[in-house]
UniProtKB/Swiss-Prot annotation:
It is found in: Cytoplasm. It catalyses: dZDP + ATP = dZTP + ADP; a 2'-deoxyribonucleoside 5'-diphosphate + ATP = a 2'-deoxyribonucleoside 5'-triphosphate + ADP; a ribonucleoside 5'-diphosphate + ATP = a ribonucleoside 5'-triphosphate + ADP. One of its GO terms (molecular function) is nucleoside diphosphate kinase activity. This is Nucleoside diphosphate kinase.
Length: 152
């Protein structure tokens, strides 16, 4: 499987609850490479663009209000199959349906405060990475243990 990138965001509830290290650690232990990281409080414009697919849904305003309510940790992770694997690490959108061992299964109980966002497809990842990061904010590097992470 070819290396790909995904966008992951720790939402304001995850930041406020002190879960940044726990979540970062899960991605690092899995073997993915962090290529972009920043903390910011998103503007309404950024939030509306990010959640644009939900613009006509009744919960859109609540999503925008929540994601702009405090700091978010925005990240770009890279690795073989990272998009699908990250979705498995994150767990179901509704935390009460998320499996134990997943981020949401272990750390969240309410859909409106589900701690983390992850891109769901390559096209979404590309859009979200471009929305949240400038190309100059992403690092292209090779971990010293790369040979121990993947074959070939």
């Amino acid at each position: 499987m070819a290396s790909e990138r995904t966008f992951i965001a720790i939402k304001p509830d995850g930041v406020q609850r002190g879960l940044i290290g726990e979540i970062l650690g899960r991605f690092e232990r899995k073997g993915f490479k962090l290529v972009g990281l920043k903390q910011l409080t998103p503007s309404r414009e950024l939030a509306e663009q990010h959640y644009g697919v939900h613009k006509e849904r009744p919960f859109f305003a609540g999503l925008v209000d929540f994601i702009t309510s405090g700091p978010v940790v925005a990240m770009v992770w890279e690795g073989d199959g990272v998009i699908a694997s990250a979705r498995k690490l994150i767990g179901a959108t509704k935390p009460l349906e998320a499996e134990p061992g997943t981020i949401r299964g272990d750390l969240a109980i309410n859909i409106g405060r589900n701690v983390i966002h992850g891109s769901d497809a390559p096209e979404t990842a590309q859009f979200e990475i471009g929305l949240w990061f400038q190309a100059s904010e992403l690092s292209d590097w090779t971990p010293s243990d790369q040979g121990w992470r993947t074959e070939g």
